[in-house]
Amino acid sequence: MTDEEYMQRALELAMRGAGWVNPNPLVGAVVVRDGRIIGEGWHPAFGELHAERQALADCRQRGEATEGATIYVTLEPCCHTGKTPPCTEALIEAGIARVVMGAPDPNPKVDGGGVAQLQAAGIEVVQGVLVEECQEINRAFFHYIETGKPYVILKYAMTLDGKIATRSGKSKWITGEEARKRVHADRQRYAAIMVGVNTVIKDDPLLTCRLDSFESSDVEELQVVDESDFEDLLEREMAEDEAAFEADLEGCADSTLRGFGTFKPRCSNPIRIICDTRLRTPLDSQVVRTAAEIPTYIATCERDLEKHLPYRERECDIIVVPEAAGHVDIEILMEKLGELGIDSVIVEGGAEINWSVLAYEVVSCVQAYVAPKIFGGAAAPSPVGGLGVEAPKYAIELSDPKVTQLGRDLLIECEVK
């Protein structure tokens, strides 16, 4: 196998941490000696061992010696002590002879320091193998490290004639099951989901990841859980999680370490953020009623603590932000979310909040799910409302699209320039 093939395997392993490592990066590692994989690992969750240490531990579990081996890792090994000890020390102590690296780590605590430490210890370091792929899986992490603000994805589903609902406001379902699986995989992967209060009032959504136990790296295996079953699922989770996880570990293959089994016991719900300028979120809404189980923030311009109290009693957190043009100041909100450690946000609101996040220039990526259907109707809403631009030359410019077919639907993804 080539360096690229081993790195591709490390990328697959890295994705198993999706939804669990935030605000840390996704990282995978593969240890190879004499053309044979002797250990594998990935960063399974925030605060747990990093991929390199997991892979070295896997080698020990298998009874394999690491002296003179090569390790393939998707991100530059860390060289500082945070929640866990530095990985560079572990690699040096393990006698690793060669480190093949994907992307450099822009974290100021690393930023080339990992490479320097390894080279100073006489370890050969090869950089830039599948670097674009390694950067792609951590685009949210890189953005957060460089700006201190969340990586924002604007997501919507529409018909081929650009409608997100019929003239009567009905929208279930525009896209098919494969597209909806992908949406929930992203809810698993990214830290938070944000909507406007009008969406809460109109649709009363749960804003959860409705995927049952699944392997994070394999979207094709995801199973959708009906929203109507979610409250029952929450109750079962409390009783079943520990037992289910232990059962998973008992059933792991010998080569899989206890503590980071192949399958996650339950899906990971995103943090929920409601933009609510005047604090109108209904107290009996599903997001408020389930705030004790799922972290829920309400961003508002309302400063009256008496009005905050009913929400706080139901375990919602209130974020007070300034008002701008009659709405929550989105730019200030993003700064506050960054301070809370939220590295990524999916915006799944209606036309007005979609325009707001675009107008404030906080969006990094646009995801448009397009179904081969036509709704028609002048009263049927489009994905982006607001004032809009005056002339084509003022359009918000996007990158060349990446197009993925999901069943009969298309996912069109563009970065905002």
Question: What do the predicted segments below correspond to?
Answer:
Residues V31, R36-E133, T256, Y297, ...:
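Zn2+-dependent cytidine deaminase-like catalytic core
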Residues P108-K109, Q135, N354, G376:
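Generic structural signal for helix capping and beta-alpha/helix-loop junctions
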Residues T2-P25, K83, Y151-V152, M158-K417:
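Enzymes that bind and transform nitrogen-containing heteroaromatic metabolites
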Residues N138-Y151:
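Flexible, polar/acidic helix-loop-strand segments at domain edges
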Residues Q8, E12-M15, G39, H50-R53, ...:
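A broad detector of short, well-ordered amphipathic alpha-helices
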Residues E64-E67, A94, T147, Q188, ...:
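Structured loop/turn residues at beta-strand edges in well-structured enzyme cores
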Residues G28:
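Helix-turn-helix
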Residues V115, V131-N138, R180-R187:
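Hydrophobic, well-ordered secondary-structure segments
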